[in-house]
């Protein structure tokens, strides 16, 4: 963090100089334009009158030319000073950060350089599609000769089409999508469809008393959601009482908050990605964020290993010598290790919950069976092995 702070201080200085230079440059040029404009008007007036150029006007022209030359030289000098400040940022980065990080990961991690390049290009393309930068993704595919199937693109195209409509406060495409995927959204316990109907109802409320009948008619869409969202529906129906007086000055003014649009975009993105089998954040974003957390630790480990000359500790290409805590945000799958066999469970050897509540792996359960009965290794309870239930975390 200290290294980042040092670089940030240099960046702040550069940004301040950019701002100051821009303001000074704009002011100086405006003054020059004003002076030249006045001089031009005087010259035009003298030409119309047919009078020769006076000594005073000649002096003014000389002073104006000198002022232009001095201003240009001053701006050029200030511009050079900015270049030196930018160079200091680069030096601060070199001084505070280790530029050589290739040694942290062995080349043996990748099957080949071509495979490495292909995986990276695919990760970048997927990130661009997910961010809605479709034209950039297509351009990268053409330049890298990367073949991307239409089936891969289609979910991203649909997702971004609906998100663009939501950013323009158009609920139509999102509502159509939610209705067509209603059953699968219910299986996810999603409230997306209700939130979309609620937002449409709020838009009608914002239309004032003229939209009251239309809002009452639209409220019939809430009927399927009455059991799960009764309180929220009551609040919205109660707001109709204040419609003629104006919701802005009523206890229901929070309904008009623009944050509802940001919330609906987040909800749609999360639920749609879950439904389409996509992650909310692209693999590139997750890898980059994880790398920012893990890289300093890996650099320290590498330095210690080299200092103590114990390179054999880090010999596996798919395993680190120590566990690195990346934070809850990077936890995607719960992991259970069997306390009996001290092995991580898997699809072929899943965790099994016994009647007594203790959990062991299936392999451990099979090894503990004696005479058709199973005695829990942690308590005196004896039970039928068939009574064990598989657990899915």
Curated annotation (Swiss-Prot):
Annotated compartments: Cytoplasm, Cytosol
GO MF entries: ubiquitin protein ligase activity; zinc ion binding
Domain called LisH: residue spans: 116-148
Annotated ranges, domain CTLH: 155-212
Enzyme class of the recorded protein, top EC level: transferase
Annotated InterPro entries: CRA_dom (IPR013144), CTLH/CRA (IPR024964), CTLH_C (IPR006595), Fyv10_fam (IPR045098), LisH (IPR006594), RMD5B_dRING (IPR037681), ZF_RING_GID (IPR044063), Znf-RING_euk (IPR027370)
Domain of life from the UniProt record: Eukaryota
GO CC field: cytosol
Pfam families, per database record: CTLH (PF10607), zf-RING_UBOX (PF13445)
Keyword check for Cytoplasm: yes
Keyword Cytoplasm: yes
Modified residues (N-acetylmethionine): 1
GO biological process per UniProt: proteasome-mediated ubiquitin-dependent protein catabolic process
The entry's keywords: Acetylation, Cytoplasm, Metal-binding, Transferase, Ubl conjugation pathway, Zinc, Zinc-finger
RING-Gid-type zinc-finger residues: 338-379
Stretch forming the signal peptide: none
Major site of localization recorded for this protein: cytoplasm
Catalytic activity field: S-ubiquitinyl-[E2 ubiquitin-conjugating enzyme]-L-cysteine + [acceptor protein]-L-lysine = [E2 ubiquitin-conjugating enzyme]-L-cysteine + N(6)-ubiquitinyl-[acceptor protein]-L-lysine
Coiled-coil region list: none
EC annotation from Swiss-Prot or TrEMBL: 2.3.2.27
Quaternary structure, from the entry: Identified in the CTLH complex that contains GID4, RANBP9 and/or RANBP10, MKLN1, MAEA, RMND5A (or alternatively its paralog RMND5B), GID8, ARMC8, WDR26 and YPEL5. Within this complex, MAEA, RMND5A (or alternatively its paralog RMND5B), GID8, WDR26, and RANBP9 and/or RANBP10 form the catalytic core, while GID4, MKLN1, ARMC8 and YPEL5 have ancillary roles.
PANTHER family in alphabetical order: E3 UBIQUITIN-PROTEIN TRANSFERASE RMND5B, MACROPHAGE ERYTHROBLAST ATTACHER-RELATED
Function: Core component of the CTLH E3 ubiquitin-protein ligase complex that selectively accepts ubiquitin from UBE2H and mediates ubiquitination and subsequent proteasomal degradation of the transcription factor HBP1. MAEA and RMND5A are both required for catalytic activity of the CTLH E3 ubiquitin-protein ligase complex. Catalytic activity of the complex is required for normal cell proliferation. The CTLH E3 ubiquitin-protein ligase complex is not required for the degradation of enzymes involved in gluconeogenesis, such as FBP1.
Protein's name according to its UniProt entry: E3 ubiquitin-protein transferase RMND5B
Annotated organism of origin: Mus musculus
């Amino acid at each position: 963090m200290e290294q980042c702070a040092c670089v940030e201080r240099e960046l702040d200085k550069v940004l301040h100089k950019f701002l100051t230079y821009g303001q000074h440059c704009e002011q100086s040029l405006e003054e020059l334009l004003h002076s030249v404009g006045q001089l031009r008007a005087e010259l035009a007036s003298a030409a119309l009158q047919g009078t020769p150029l006076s000594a005073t006007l000649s002096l003014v022209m000389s002073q104006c030319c000198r002022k232009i030359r001095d201003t240009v030289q001053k701006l050029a000098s200030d511009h050079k000073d900015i270049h030196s400040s930018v160079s200091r940022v680069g030096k601060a980065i070199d001084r505070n950060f280790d530029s050589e990080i290739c040694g942290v990961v062995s080349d043996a991690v990748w099957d080949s350089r071509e495979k490495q390049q292909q995986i990276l290009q695919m990760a970048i393309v997927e990130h661009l599609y997910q961010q809605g930068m479709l034209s950039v993704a297509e351009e990268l595919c053409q330049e890298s000769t990367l073949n991307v199937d239409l089936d891969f693109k289609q979910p991203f195209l649909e997702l971004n089409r609906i998100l663009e409509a939501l950013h323009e406060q158009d609920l139509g495409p999102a509502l159509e999508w939610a209705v067509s995927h209603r059953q699968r959204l219910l299986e996810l316990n999603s409230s997306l469809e209700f939130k979309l109907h609620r937002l449409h109802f709020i838009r009608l409320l914002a239309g004032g008393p003229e939209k009251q009948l239309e809002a009452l008619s639209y409220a019939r869409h809430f009927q399927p959601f009455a059991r799960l969202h009764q309180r929220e529906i009551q609040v919205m129906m109660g707001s109709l009482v204040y419609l003629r007086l104006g919701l802005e000055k009523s206890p229901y003014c929070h309904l008009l908050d623009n944050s509802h649009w940001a919330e609906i975009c987040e909800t749609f993105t999360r639920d749609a990605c879950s439904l389409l089998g996509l992650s909310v954040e692209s693999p590139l974003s997750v890898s980059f964020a994880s790398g920012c957390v893990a890289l300093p630790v890996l650099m320290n480990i590498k330095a210690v290993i080299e200092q103590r000359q114990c390179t054999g500790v880090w010999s596996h290409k798919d395993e680190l010598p120590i566990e690195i805590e990346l934070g809850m945000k990077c936890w995607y799958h719960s992991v259970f290790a069997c306390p009996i066999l001290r092995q991580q469970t898997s699809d072929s050897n899943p965790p099994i919950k016994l009647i007594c509540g203790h959990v062991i792996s299936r392999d451990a359960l099979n090894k503990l069976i004696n005479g058709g009965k199973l005695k829990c290794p942690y308590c005196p309870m004896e039970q039928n092995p068939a009574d064990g239930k598989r657990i899915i975390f």
